[in-house]
Amino acid sequence: MDLLSIKDPAFLKNLSNEELESLSAEIRRFLIETLSESGGHIGPNLGVVELTIALHKEFDSPKDKFLWDVGHQSYVHKLLTGRGKDFATLRQHKGLCGFPKRNESEHDVWETGHSSTSLSGAMGMAAARDLKGTNEYIIPIIGDGALTGGMALEALNHIGHEQKDMIVILNDNEMSIAPNVGAIHSMLGRLRTAGKYQWVKDELEYLFKRIPAVGGKLAATAERIKDSLKYLLVSGMFFEELGFTYLGPVDGHSYDELFENLQYAKKTKGPVLLHVITKKGKGYKPAETDKTGTWHGTGPYKIDTGDFVKPKAAAPSWSSLVSETVRKLAREDERIVAITPAMPVGSKLEGFASEFPERMFDVGIAEQHAATMAAGLATQNMKPFLAIYSTFLQRAYDQVVHDICRQNLNVFIGIDRAGLVGADGETHQGVFDIAFLRHIPNLVLMMPKDENEGQHMVNTAVKYDDGPIAMRFPRGNGLGVKMDKELKTIPIGTWEVLRPGTDAVILTFGTTIPMALAAAEELQKEGRSVRVVNARFIKPLDENMLKEILNEGLPILTIEEAVLQGGFGSSILEFAHEHQSYSPIIDRMGIPDQFIEHGSVAKLLEEIGMTKEDVIRRIRLLTPVKTHKGIGS
């Protein structure tokens, strides 16, 4: 079959199971070949081929609603709904999104990227369906990893209480990105080995009906026996007690089992949970045998060997630099512990976990819990390092405010993937953290210009004993600069002048410093002398240096790879307003008031006007203007 010519999933209705098996194999070959060139979430998608095909054959999308939790496993869904012809553009600028996208297809009814949201969305859709009097099926598909998220458990509780008709597909592959952890994961493990729940339940019901209805103590004893037998023999009682009809576990690669149970679920009133066992990476040995999460999402790779295509002589990643520096310091300070919400591989904490297993806590997809657990550790004079992506820190905002900063606890927050991340798009860009952190009392916020300064900032954060401190660092590799052998501490709230200048000042930090220096070099050729300041402390500001700059009356350009509204540039405007009686000449560059889609970071920066050429253009506009004299002149 020509996968690129598929227009909609209606053709599946006429295929036999044997033909579906052939289609499954063809889709897997297509995914393995295509993703070897572009990269993407190969592991999750290889695992849900049969499940996705079965869902589209049994139900009628888009009338029936599929909600793909997290959404990285939606590639097969995209192929079956007519987007194969655009698959070569996957995760590229203006191309197919790597996650469900409502404006991309009518079959994408729920946008995702973060985990554990599908059940709440499904509850809303089911409530709307019932209010409108329609009869479509609502089918959220959630992984066993996402099920550990608190929001998913809140939704299970509410759905069970409301008894809305809904078919929840639990896609159980024993992993989220890294292997799953926690009591719920252990419970699901017991379910996997317990056999067919519905068969056992039906047999028990038959047995119970044969117990004679008698009065008094004997009747009460019989009821207790029934209840005890249920809990002893039927592991699905967890979901049943929440109000769900539990079906499974089902082989997620068997069409016979999938169709039998989906048809049973369609006839069942109230919420149903169908427990489907799948193999992440199925059909491609390197991905299928992956135990660490390496093949969850990848860059390009060689199909025959499974080797990843890496840039030559790349510097170590920022995640490695930070985690390894923390690991080094942990050898000297037994109070240092590390916490990650299900991202030990992405945060490069495998080495720390191997050396200090008792001081490493992977709490699962539970960012709120991770933040407050860090606070609890800090109250006992421990030194918690909370490794978390910028985009996921959004989910723990209240805990950072209420539990960490309000109590002024010594928690080191390592904000990974800060700034634009590229191909994962809107849901993963790390551009909001400055705006939602800098106004919180007690918190120090900083970002290094390179990996050498980065290791010193990690040391500074670990040695800091006056409250919470956060360090932003980008996705990808460092610049390859020379590294100091001895770690230093950087005075809190101090900036540094990287290049002198007398006509204008650029205040920036982190990833935008090389661009600012390159622009200043070009402008020097035109006779414009531009000072470049490494404003490495976003909070607190270096007030002494900033006052000196304002007193000089020079025009200022702030640059940040983060949202402008409420960001670093805003803090400079606020400071200038509070300390001067006139409006200073200050221009700001940063992320505009919009969600930034997927594409290469370079392409995205070009699109929003954050290139070296844009810096040069803005400085040219600033420098001809006659500047005011500063305070005390």
UniProtKB/Swiss-Prot annotation:
It comes from the Bacteria. The gene is dxs. Thiamine diphosphate binds at H72, G113, H114, S115, G145, A146, N173, Y284, E367. It catalyses: D-glyceraldehyde 3-phosphate + pyruvate + H(+) = 1-deoxy-D-xylulose 5-phosphate + CO2. Belongs to the transketolase family. DXPS subfamily. Keywords: Isoprene biosynthesis, Magnesium, Metal-binding, Thiamine biosynthesis, Thiamine pyrophosphate, Transferase. It comes from Bacillus licheniformis (strain ATCC 14580 / DSM 13 / JCM 2505 / CCUG 7422 / NBRC 12200 / NCIMB 9375 / NCTC 10341 / NRRL NRS-1264 / Gibson 46). GO terms for molecular function: 1-deoxy-D-xylulose-5-phosphate synthase activity; magnesium ion binding; thiamine pyrophosphate binding. Mg(2+) binds at D144, N173. Pathway: Metabolic intermediate biosynthesis; 1-deoxy-D-xylulose 5-phosphate biosynthesis; 1-deoxy-D-xylulose 5-phosphate from D-glyceraldehyde 3-phosphate and pyruvate: step 1/1. Its EC number is 2.2.1.7. Binds 1 Mg(2+) ion per subunit. Binds 1 thiamine pyrophosphate per subunit. Pfam families: DXP_synthase_N, Transket_pyr, Transketolase_C. CDD domains: TPP_DXS, TPP_PYR_DXS_TK_like. PROSITE patterns: TRANSKETOLASE_1 (PS00801), TRANSKETOLASE_2 (PS00802). PANTHER family: 1-D-DEOXYXYLULOSE 5-PHOSPHATE SYNTHASE-RELATED (PTHR43322), 1-DEOXY-D-XYLULOSE-5-PHOSPHATE SYNTHASE, CHLOROPLASTIC (PTHR43322:SF5). This is 1-deoxy-D-xylulose-5-phosphate synthase.
